[in-house]
A protein has these predicted regions:
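Short amphipathic alpha-helical segments at helix-loop
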Residues: 1-4, 33, 84-91, 126-130
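Extreme N-terminal tail/first-helix region
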Residues: 1-14, 94
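A non-catalytic, amphipathic alpha-helix used as a structural packing/dimerization or gating element
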Residues: 11-18, 97-105, 140, 144
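Solvent-exposed, charged/polar functional surfaces in cytosolic regulatory/catalytic domains
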Residues: 18-25, 105-109, 148
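A general structural signal marking secondary-structure boundaries and capping sites
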Residues: 23-26, 110-117, 156
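Short helix-to-loop capping/linker segments positioned immediately adjacent to catalytic or ligand/cofactor-binding
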Residues: 26-32, 90-95
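Short, contiguous alpha-helical
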Residues: 28-78, 120-157
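Acidic/histidine-rich alpha-helical segments that form the ligand environment
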Residues: 75-118
């Protein structure tokens, strides 16, 4: 891992910490995003990161990717609904823990990518990305969620 990749991963950690702080302050029953309470929001994150974990596992060990019923990730609404539905029986704390375990595993895999491979394309279900681009996109995704949640929580004027 290079200093640049370590800094990117640190930024990814910071974006997650900021997002978690915002979500933690919310009532469990209010909408974090339209139609999603906190548990559903964590289920969304857990679902996507489970796929990312599998992609990195496949790229390092050749372990086949799981076949999801909504594998056409061009339909993001169906994928997100699937992630939430899969976790309906889980508690908010357990689903958040799944997020944290997935993120830990992803970071370990990122740390194990040789420097010369960090900018090689990796096939994700939604397209090819380098590890660098994946981390940049993860940071943006979490910061976008944080901004959207804060905006949704603002009183109407």
């Amino acid at each position: 891992m290079t200093q640049d990749s370590a800094a990117l991963i640190a930024d990814m950690d910071q974006a997650r910490a900021e997002l978690w702080q915002i979500v933690a302050a919310l009532d469990p029953e209010i909408d974090v995003c339209p139609g999603w309470n906190k548990r559903d929001f964590y289920a969304h994150i857990a679902g996507w990161e489970a796929i990312v974990y599998e992609v990195f596992l496949y790229n390092t060990t050749g372990t086949p990717l799981k076949d999801y019923p909504y594998n056409n990730l061009d339909d993001l609404d169906a994928a997100n609904a699937g992630f939430v539905a899969e976790r309906q029986s889980g508690t908010e704390d357990n689903i958040k823990l799944e997020c944290e375990i997935n993120r830990y595993a992803i970071k370990r895999m990122l740390n194990d990518i040789p420097v010369e491979n960090f900018d090689k394309p990796i096939q994700f279900p939604w397209g090819k990305l380098t590890a660098t681009k994946f981390v940049q996109d993860a940071i943006k995704h979490e910061r976008d969620h944080a901004a959207d949640i804060l905006k949704l929580q603002q009183p109407l004027t």
